[in-house]
Structure formats: structure tokens, C-alpha cells
């Protein structure tokens, strides 16, 4: 969870022909005061691409723009333990954040602290950090095992093997296969039910005609 990944890595990864997108996120837990109580927040940075993807999960408010009146606009993520809403303010040690939007989902694990999402520039201004804790990579061809191995080697060599490399492609393939198999079973079941219903109707008509 430490911010140790140089942003140059994102540029190097995006330069590879097999890579569709590469993007990083910074992370920092911060003490904060909000809704009249002392607590903490999990501050996470998004770049432009991630904010574009977040639009579909926006359930209220807008995406963050530039800071106004000395306050930094941020998003938060809806959760049963997070009661922050649009318009709420979060007071840090020497800065104030304003919630301008709420997401109904995020790729982060739920914690006891509210997830607060800001721009990379805001993150840098608030924490002084500009390295990433996580870099995500999307491939143009998810079956390109050679490309995956090349990326793995690049990251391991660059970071002196001090990196956790997680390949979610195989897991996503299994999820997708399970999804289609489930749909196939459901549709087959519906077809059988429809066939039985039609046969019952035909039998009822035949019995009615025979009774006459």
C-alpha cells in the first residue's frame, strides 16, 4: 500500500504495443474531522481515465473540478459505514475537502474509514506525494501470454523484484465462462418450461374437442 511506483512506469507500460491502458492510483490514510466527529479517511487519487469510468457509478452530484474558495472537491463511495453525502465537508489538518459526488461502487475493499477520491493534482497538494501505490494495466488482447510475461519482467526488473504482480485475466475468464454457462442453463430451463406449457395447452384443446 505504499506509494513507491514511479509515474514513469505508466508511460513505459503504455508505450508497449500490447497495452491498451495503464493507470495508477495513490493512497494515503489521513486523520480528518467530518460530520462533527474525529476520524480518518482513505484518500485515493484518480486520473482522467478513471474519472471517466466513474461516471457510470455516480449516483449523486458531479465529478470533481478545480478547487474553489480554498476547498478541494472530492468524491466518496456509498457504503453502510459511510454517511458522507454531497455538500459535506471534511477538515484535514491544513486543508478542507468538499464532497461533490457519491459513487455507488468502487474497486476498493470496504474499510471503517470513508473512501475519498480526488484528482492526482489535489492528492499531490494535500500529501506532497506523487508516486503510485498501484498500477493497473489493460491489454488489447487478454490472451497474449507473451505480453503478460514481458510486462511482468519489466516491472520486476525496474523495481528490483519488490513488486506484487497480480494477473486477474484468468479469474475474469472464469467469471465470464461461469456467467455464460449459467445463462445457458437458465435459457434451457425456460425453453423446457415453455415446451411443457405448449404441450399442456395442446392437450387441453384436444381434450376439449374430444369432450364435445
Enumerate the language-model features and the residues they cover.
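A short beta-strand structural signal in non-transmembrane regions
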Residues: 129-154
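Short conserved AdoMet
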Residues: 14-17, 156, 160
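Peri-transmembrane interface segments
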Residues: 150-152, 158-198, 207-212
Amino acid at each position: 500500500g505504499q506509494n513507491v511506483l514511479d509515474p514513469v512506469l505508466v508511460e513505459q507500460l503504455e508505450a508497449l504495443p500490447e497495452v491498451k491502458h495503464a493507470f495508477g492510483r495513490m493512497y494515503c490514510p489521513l486523520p480528518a474531522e467530518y460530520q462533527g466527529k474525529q476520524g480518518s479517511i482513505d484518500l485515493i487519487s484518480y486520473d482522467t481515465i478513471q474519472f471517466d469510468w466513474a461516471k457510470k457509478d455516480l449516483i449523486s452530484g458531479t465529478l470533481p473540478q478545480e478547487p474553489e474558495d480554498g476547498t478541494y472537491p472530492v468524491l466518496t463511495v456509498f457504503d453502510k459505514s459511510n454517511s458522507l453525502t454531497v455538500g459535506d465537508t471534511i477538515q484535514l489538518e491544513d486543508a478542507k475537502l468538499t464532497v461533490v459526488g457519491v459513487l455507488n461502487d468502487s474497486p476498493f475493499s470496504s474499510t471503517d474509514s470513508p473512501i475519498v477520491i480526488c484528482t492526482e493534482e489535489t492528492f499531490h497538494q494535500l500529501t506532497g506525494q506523487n508516486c503510485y501505490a498501484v498500477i493497473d494495466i489493460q491489454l488489447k488482447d487478454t490472451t497474449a501470454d507473451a505480453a503478460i510475461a514481458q510486462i511482468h519482467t519489466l516491472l520486476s526488473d525496474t523495481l528490483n523484484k519488490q513488486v506484487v504482480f497480480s494477473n486477474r485475466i484468468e479469474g475474469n475468464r472464469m467469471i465470464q465462462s461461469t456467467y455464460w454457462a449459467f445463462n445457458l442453463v437458465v435459457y434451457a430451463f425456460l425453453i423446457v418450461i415453455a415446451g411443457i406449457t405448449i404441450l399442456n395447452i395442446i392437450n387441453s384443446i384436444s381434450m376439449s374437442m374430444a369432450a364435445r
